[in-house]
Amino acid sequence: MSIVKEFREFIARGNVVDLAVGVIIGAAFNGIVKSLVDGVIMPPIGLVTGGLDFSKLQWVLKPEDPVTEAVELVAIQYGAFINTVIQFLIVAVVVFLLVKLVNHIRRADAAEPAPEAPAAPTPEERLLTEIRDLLAKPATVTAAPKAAAAPVAKPKTKPKA
């Protein structure tokens, strides 16, 4: 399964544990990720785009009056939104990798094989066990009962002529 597909499934499912981990990680790394985006990621992107500073991109709906300062600037600051989306994606990838690691550990724990039942003894082992048991019994000598002797028939001889 590809990382992109797993990431898409991760974002789409509504697991409470995943959400809690995401909130905690997102809150903990907010300052780090903001610094990473603003100071490391966005300057090279700005350089590639001709010195464009995304944080200052905006659509001015109503310009400010610099003389009287009575009218404030009204603008949609989509550059700040772009920075926030990049920050979110970084946090989401980190949380995804963390959850992937936890799931891998859970699967490894669940996949531990149950202890095997002892194998049935082979015929040789059964025979050796019987011999061992017989040798372990105390030796008792008992006389075999004498059988009544049956009369032995004499062979008939033919008279000599």
Curated annotation (Swiss-Prot):
Region Disordered, residue ranges: 142-161
InterPro entries (alphabetical): Mechanosensitive_channel_CS, MS_channel, MSC/AndL, MscL_channel
Family matches, as PROSITE patterns: MSCL
Tagged with keyword Nucleotide-binding: no
Compartments in which it is found: Cell inner membrane
Predominant location category: membrane
One Gene Ontology term of the molecular function aspect: mechanosensitive monoatomic ion channel activity
Keywords on record: Cell inner membrane, Cell membrane, Ion channel, Ion transport, Membrane, Transmembrane, Transmembrane helix, Transport
Domain of life: Bacteria
Pfam families tied to this protein: MscL
Annotated transmembrane regions: 21-41, 79-99
Listed GO CC annotations: plasma membrane
Membrane topology recorded in Swiss-Prot or TrEMBL: Multi-pass membrane protein
Record's compositionally biased regions (Low complexity): 142-154
UniProt subunit comment: Homopentamer.
Annotated function: Channel that opens in response to stretch forces in the membrane lipid bilayer. May participate in the regulation of osmotic pressure changes within the cell.
Family according to the record: Belongs to the MscL family.
The name this protein goes by in its record: Large-conductance mechanosensitive channel
Organism whose genome encodes this protein: Caulobacter sp. (strain K31)
Lineage: Bacteria, Pseudomonadati, Pseudomonadota, Alphaproteobacteria, Caulobacterales
Gene for this chain: mscL
